[in-house]
């Protein structure tokens, strides 16, 4: 299969899982999974409940370590130690479906929560954070301060705009890889469109993303490649440019019915 559009010749993937399995007692959630995300690539992750999507993503996030024999590589370097702290220190950020924003706080405070900018004296640099928030909203979200001011309370924003804040926050802190955990759940059609535009922007600024969603109609238009998981195994990997949505839906249906691509 040809290299995906997001790949860069000669560059190792941002993250790569090789032969990763994960068991919990007698239950095997992942079995021999090979998975990678290249720089400037958006990778979709599809599969029914129980297919292994959540476990795979939690391995990438550092919540789970692979069973013996599985390996994780970051920019081509094998990771002998893997944890949430390690993954985050390398620039792996997650945008959850709940968005993890403080509704009663202003936009600028949400963008810098836990990583506040400070003056040389160690005081909170409120003016700088407001100015940076305005710049980020303009560059990443397409908002002018006249339309949506950084001092506006998050609760006044739409669902799609809130996802934009969460994604922009991740990008500001030099995220190499943004994990999007069903970011369109519960959103209207118009807000879903806004969110998908924010997802596309991740690639435009040179970063990568994993997009998890149950809705193929949301995933297909924005990804470069798609992994289909079934019962803990990779049932298929597709370049979007090489498969139509109708053909992909047929294959997903076949996998769900038979557990194979044959």
Identify the meaning behind each predicted range:
Residues 2-262:
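Glycine-rich phosphate-binding loops of nucleotide-dependent enzymes
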């Amino acid at each position: 299969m040809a290299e995906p559009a997001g790949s860069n010749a000669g560059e190792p993937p941002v993250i790569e899982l090789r032969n990763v399995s994960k068991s919990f007692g007698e239950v095997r959630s992942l079995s021999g999974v090979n998975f990678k995300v290249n720089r400037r690539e958006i990778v979709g992750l599809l599969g029914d409940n129980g297919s292994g999507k959540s476990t795979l993503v939690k391995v990438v996030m550092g919540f789970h370590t692979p069973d013996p024999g599985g390996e994780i590589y970051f920019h081509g370097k094998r990771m002998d130690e893997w944890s949430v702290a390690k993954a985050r220190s390398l620039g792996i950020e997650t945008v959850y479906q709940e968005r993890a924003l403080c509704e009663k706080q202003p936009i600028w405070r949400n963008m810098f929560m836990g990583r506040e900018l400070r003056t040389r004296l160690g005081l909170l640099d409120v003016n700088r954070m407001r100015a940076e928030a305005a710049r980020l909203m303009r560059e990443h979200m397409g908002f002018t301060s006249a339309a949506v001011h950084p001092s506006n309370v998050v609760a006044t924003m739409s669902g799609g705009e809130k996802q934009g804040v969460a994604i922009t926050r991740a990008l500001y802190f030099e995220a190499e890889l943004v994990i999007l955990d069903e970011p369109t759940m519960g959103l209207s059609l118009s807000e879903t469109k806004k969110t998908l535009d924010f997802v596309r922007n991740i690639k435009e600024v040179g970063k990568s993303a994993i997009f998890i969603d149950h809705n193929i109609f949301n995933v297909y238009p924005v990804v470069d490649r798609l992994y289909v998981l079934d019962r803990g195994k990779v049932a298929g990997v597709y370049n979007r440019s090489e498969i139509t949505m109708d053909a992909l839906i047929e294959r997903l249906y076949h996998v769900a019915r038979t557990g194979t691509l044959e």
